[in-house]
């Protein structure tokens, strides 16, 4: 389509993000067809700027965990994440345009923001994205988008550089279990970008089971 090669704000996905991470609390499956990973109107969906609110619409109406889970998705899934000022602390959440969504943030809130759980979790996942090209530019292959759980690969290869990230997301209020068979997981050494723990996947019958904490994320790296 005309102008399909231009990087733009990802409005179709934005509406889904608000439903999944806002008070509607829809399941991860709501995001699947808005990703356009295989076919769609965009020449390159990986260059779209992903977001859940901005100055021209109501801010995301979510509790702290909603923001944390939204950021865990934005900084691990396809696209270029964009965070509107103040959302790193849940500022004026739910407020509409001209009803508070553009209010002055101020130095006092900036100083206090470092103690916000939204900010601390955002800082962590943003740093992990910054350090790993698979999360920035890797192809996304979905394994599971259902209810409170999501699992997908980000696969990057350029020249002699290669990295695979297995992303596990849990937006539920209880720990969630994940298991993968030999057809889903490559044998060899994997390392958690979250904890630093290493895992050796057996080459004879590779399988893996793990648990992701409530409102948590796991990123396993294979290089």
Model-identified regions with their sequence ranges:
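Solvent-exposed beta-strand/loop surfaces of large extracellular or lumenal domains
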Residues: 191-207
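Beta-sheet entry/capping signal
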Residues: 47-49, 80-83, 164-166
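Conserved, mostly hydrophobic/aromatic
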Residues: 55, 74, 86-88, 125, ...
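Short hydrophobic/aromatic beta-strand or adjacent loop that forms the aromatic wall/cage
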Residues: 148-150, 163, 214-219
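Asparagine-centered strand-capping/turn motif at beta-strand->loop junctions
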Residues: 168-172
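Active-site neighborhood of divalent metal-dependent phosphoester/pyrophosphate hydrolases
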Residues: 52-59
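Active-site-proximal helices and loops of the catalytic beta/alpha 8
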Residues: 1-44, 48, 64-65, 73-76, ...
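C-terminal beta-strand-rich structural cap/linker in extracellular carbohydrate-active enzymes
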Residues: 202-223
């Amino acid at each position: 389509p005309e102008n399909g090669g231009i990087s733009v704000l990802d409005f179709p996905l934005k509406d889904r993000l608000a439903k999944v991470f806002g008070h509607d609390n829809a399941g991860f499956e709501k995001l699947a067809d808005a990703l356009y990973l295989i076919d769609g109107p965009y020449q390159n969906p990986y260059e779209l700027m992903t977001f859940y609110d901005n100055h021209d619409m109501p801010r995301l109406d979510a509790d702290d965990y909603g923001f944390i889970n939204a950021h865990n998705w934005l900084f691990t899934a396809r696209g270029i994440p964009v965070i509107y000022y103040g959302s790193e602390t849940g500022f004026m959440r739910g407020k509409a345009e001209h009803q508070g969504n553009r209010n002055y943030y101020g130095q006092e809130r900036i100083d206090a923001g470092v103690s916000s759980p939204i900010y601390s979790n955002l800082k962590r996942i943003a740093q992990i994205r910054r350090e790993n090209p698979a999360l920035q530019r890797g192809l996304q292959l979905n394994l599971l988008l259902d209810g409170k759980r999501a699992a997908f690969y980000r696969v990057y290869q350029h020249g002699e550089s290669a990295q695979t990230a297995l992303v596990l997301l849990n937006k539920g209020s209880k720990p969630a279990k994940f298991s993968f068979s030999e057809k889903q997981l490559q044998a060899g050494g994997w390392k958690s970008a979250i904890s630093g723990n290493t895992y050796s996947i057996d080459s004879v019958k590779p399988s893996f089971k793990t648990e992701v904490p409530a409102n948590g994320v796991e990123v396993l790296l294979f290089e």
